Amino acid sequence: MATEEPVIVNEVVEEQAAPETVKDEANPPAKSGKAKKETKAKKPAAPRKRSATPTHPPYFEMIKDAIVTLKERTGSSQHAITKFIEEKQKSLPSNFKKLLLTQLKKFVASEKLVKVKNSYKLPSGSKPAAAAVPAKKKPAAAKSKPAAKPKAAVKPKAKPAAKAKPAAKAKPAAKAKPAAKAKPAAKAKPAAKAKPVAKAKPKAAAAAKPKAAVKPKAAPAKTKAAVKPNLKAKTTTAKVAKTATRTTPSRKAAPKATPAKKEPVKKAPAKNVKSPAKKATPKRGRK
């Protein structure tokens, strides 16, 4: 009896050892499952492939091009920029307007653009770079200038003819005035001005002669006044003064004080005519 009991104890010990080995075998499969989960987590971390390459240039280049070409003093609005880009770039996404708004905000935050009210401008530092683009067009303009130079060479041929006309017209005094309107040489202007002055004085002297014939008493005072301007005039006016002085000696018999007094007397009768008319009526009534 005693010999059977130890055998039972050994069997129980073996049975207890068996589950431990089973537990140890169950742990390794759990590790392999974790390894699978780790590999699955790495797949989303891989970079995503873009569905298609964009057919339009970067947003900043499109916005910059729109602002430079529009050339608005206070900046270009979002609506104007979108309209310009839509006209120029035809292959744009459907949500282009929303993307453009986010890009504008992004560029303002990064100080690539300056926002003034509801308009967007380029900062002052980027304007010289933008001005370099139109600078390429200047050589084309320089090429067109040589073509315009032959026209300028043709014009000098017409100028000598224009100068010859005023030279021909400067001889008669009457034709000198239209020549002055056509912008002649500076020498023709003083000559045109001097001739009418010389002719105006003989007319004044000629006008003085009939008055002297009608009123011999008033002639001495007028001849003296005519002598003073003749000193400044040319020799032609001096001759007229000499002829006037020769006529005066024969008429010196007239009283000297009367010529100065008779001129105001002629003006006075016009005023005195009214006063005797009023006084004449009572005298006739008394008679």
Swiss-Prot record:
Highest taxon of source: Eukaryota
Subcellular location, principal: nucleus
Function: Histones H1 are necessary for the condensation of nucleosome chains into higher-order structures.
Compositional bias ranges of the Basic residues kind: 33-51, 135-202, 276-287
Subcellular location field: Nucleus; Chromosome
Protein name: Histone H1
Coiled-coil segments: none
Keyword Ubl conjugation carried by entry: no
GO terms classed as biological process: chromosome condensation; negative regulation of DNA recombination; nucleosome assembly
Boundaries of every H15 domain copy: 55-124
Protein family: Belongs to the histone H1/H5 family.
Biased composition (Low complexity): 1-11, 203-248
SMART domains, per database record: H15 (SM00526)
A Pfam family the protein falls into: Linker_histone
Gene Ontology MF, one: double-stranded DNA binding
Organism: Solanum lycopersicum (Tomato)
